[in-house]
């Protein structure tokens, strides 16, 4: 993912960080054949764009971009943070390793995306319970994610962009 962060500190200092995603190096427009209809998003129905054949821009490997979130959050932490990266990721590591009771809203979201999550072995292993949607209150444990966060905490953003985590993602794709 990606995003934009605006920071205002108590002393009046601050700034912003734009950490948008980037298309993969081998991505090109011909990979995304347009159809003759629009995709309309959001309750306001004000956002639309041309539909892409087979949802190639939204589902599967051709929808994956280079995430900017790790770089953006680590940059923000370096500029304005008061703790080190390993301390910042520690609570998330604990939750990922020990698990937590799956909230109702997340269980519903996973059930809604069951067919899509079933298509890919990795998403099925992480987000489904023996091929079925996880139910509210299920113990949601993500050991591999905990290991990734530990590595990011030790190494920093370079782990995502050229390090072990980035290499693992590139190899899978």
State the predicted function of each range.
Residues 1-173:
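Noncatalytic scaffold domains of N-terminal-nucleophile
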């Amino acid at each position: 993912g990606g995003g934009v962060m605006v920071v205002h500190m108590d002393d009046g200092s601050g700034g912003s960080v734009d950490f948008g995603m980037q298309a993969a190096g081998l991505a090109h427009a011909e990979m995304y054949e347009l159809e003759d209809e629009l995709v309309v998003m959001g309750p306001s129905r004000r956002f639309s764009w041309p539909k892409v054949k087979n949802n190639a821009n939204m589902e599967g490997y051709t929808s994956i971009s280079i995430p900017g979130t790790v770089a953006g959050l680590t940059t923000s932490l370096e500029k304005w943070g008061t703790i080190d990266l390993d301390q910042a990721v520690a609570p998330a590591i604990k939750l990922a390793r020990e698990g937590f009771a799956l909230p109702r809203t997340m269980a519903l979201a996973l059930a809604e995306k069951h067919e899509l999550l079933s298509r890919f072995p990795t998403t099925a292993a992480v987000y489904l319970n023996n091929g079925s949607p996880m139910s509210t209150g299920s113990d949601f444990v993500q050991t591999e994610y905990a290991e990734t966060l530990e590595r990011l905490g030790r190494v920093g953003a370079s782990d995502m962009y050229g390090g072990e985590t980035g290499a693992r993602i590139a190899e899978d794709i």
